[in-house]
């Protein structure tokens, strides 16, 4: 099972955010675009991550019930959902700073650009968790297709 959110998540950091940084000359507009991007993303991406984690868990449960190795689907599930605690631990302070500036705190463009660039690379790092989960799941599937479920 590949995680459909991975491409979307990477696209945000590798395409959308650079466009925002390259085309905005006012911090207010840049903050508004970030807030909108975040709003759309936080409504969709966690649901996809949880659904993908649940699918990996379902595969693990089916394999366990069939007395087959089930550790790799669990690894895929845990790896995928690790993006959530990563967000809480590593990204919340950056998110909060950006939202505080968006609410009207005095924001100079350099500070806003630096915070959004920091968010961009933290988001790339966060995107690697579901990517790693998808890689584990694909490797497991390929191993089963080629050599059976040993």
UniProtKB/Swiss-Prot annotation:
Subcellular localization is given as: Membrane
Catalytic activity, reaction form? emodin anthrone + O2 = emodin + H2O + H(+)
Q: Among its keywords, does the record have Transmembrane helix?
A: yes
Q: Which UniProt keywords apply?
A: Membrane, Monooxygenase, Oxidoreductase, Transmembrane, Transmembrane helix
Membrane-crossing residues?
Answer: 1-21, 41-61, 73-93, 128-148
* EC number(s) per entry: 1.10.3.-
Mode of membrane association? Multi-pass membrane protein
GO molecular function annotations of the record: monooxygenase activity
EC class:
oxidoreductase
- A GO term from the CC aspect: membrane
What pathway, per the record? Secondary metabolite biosynthesis
Question: Which family does the record assign?
Answer: Belongs to the anthrone oxygenase family.
Q: What role does this protein play?
A: Anthrone oxygenase; part of the gene cluster that mediates the biosynthesis of geodin, an intermediate in the biosynthesis of other natural products. The pathway begins with the synthesis of atrochrysone thioester by the polyketide synthase (PKS) gedC. The atrochrysone carboxyl ACP thioesterase gedB then breaks the thioester bond and releases the atrochrysone carboxylic acid from gedC. The atrochrysone carboxylic acid is then converted to atrochrysone which is further transformed into emodin anthrone.
Q: What is this protein called?
A: Anthrone oxygenase gedH
Question: Organism, per UniProt?
Answer: Aspergillus terreus (strain NIH 2624 / FGSC A1156)
């Amino acid at each position: 099972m590949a995680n459909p959110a991975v491409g979307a998540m990477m696209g945000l950091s590798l395409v959308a955010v650079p466009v925002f940084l390259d085309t905005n000359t006012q911090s207010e507009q840049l903050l508004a675009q970030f807030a909108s991007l975040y709003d759309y993303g936080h409504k969709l991406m966690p649901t996809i991550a949880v659904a993908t984690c649940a699918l990996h868990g379902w595969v693990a449960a089916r394999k366990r019930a069939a007395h087959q190795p089930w550790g790799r689907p669990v690894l895929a599930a845990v790896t995928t959902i690790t993006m959530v605690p990563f967000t809480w631990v590593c990204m919340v302070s950056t998110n909060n700073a950006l939202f505080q500036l968006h609410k009207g705190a005095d924001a100079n463009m350099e500070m806003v650009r630096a915070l959004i660039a920091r968010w961009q690379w933290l988001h790339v790092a966060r995107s690697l968790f579901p990517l790693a989960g998808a890689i584990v799941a694909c490797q497991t599937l390929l191993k089963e297709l080629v050599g059976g479920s040993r």
